[in-house]
């Protein structure tokens, strides 16, 4: 039996402040790349988090 193709991806949202802090979210495969302004606890500020590759 063939494996079912997943419609959603797990993506890593990495802080643009360079602290290395990240969130993991899921998004549809057809959607554009994610970017959020969220809280970075290492610098105690809200910063932009952009999608990067998961290892």
Swiss-Prot record:
One of its GO terms (cellular component) is mitochondrial large ribosomal subunit. The keyword Membrane does not apply. GO terms for biological process: mitochondrial translation. Disulfide bonds: none annotated. One of its GO terms (molecular function) is structural constituent of ribosome. It is found in: Mitochondrion. The keyword Mitochondrion applies. Keywords: Mitochondrion, Ribonucleoprotein, Ribosomal protein. It holds the Pfam family Ribosomal_L33. Signal peptide: none annotated. InterPro entries: Ribosomal_bL33 (IPR001705), Ribosomal_bL33_sf (IPR038584), Ribosomal_zn-bd (IPR011332). Its main location: mitochondrion. It comes from the Eukaryota. Component of the mitochondrial large ribosomal subunit (mt-LSU). Mature yeast 74S mitochondrial ribosomes consist of a small (37S) and a large (54S) subunit. The 37S small subunit contains a 15S ribosomal RNA (15S mt-rRNA) and at least 32 different proteins. The 54S large subunit contains a 21S rRNA (21S mt-rRNA) and at least 45 different proteins. bL33m stabilizes the tRNA acceptor stem in the E-site. Belongs to the bacterial ribosomal protein bL33 family. Component of the mitochondrial ribosome (mitoribosome), a dedicated translation machinery responsible for the synthesis of mitochondrial genome-encoded proteins, including at least some of the essential transmembrane subunits of the mitochondrial respiratory chain. The mitoribosomes are attached to the mitochondrial inner membrane and translation products are cotranslationally integrated into the membrane. PANTHER family: 54S RIBOSOMAL PROTEIN L39, MITOCHONDRIAL, LARGE RIBOSOMAL SUBUNIT PROTEIN BL33M. This is Large ribosomal subunit protein bL33m.
């Amino acid at each position: 039996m063939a494996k079912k193709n997943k419609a959603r991806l797990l993506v890593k949202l990495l802080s643009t402040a360079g602290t290395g802090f990240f969130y993991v979210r899921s998004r549809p495969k057809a959607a554009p790349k994610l970017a959020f302004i969220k809280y970075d606890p290492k610098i105690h500020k809200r910063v932009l988090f952009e999608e990067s590759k998961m290892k």
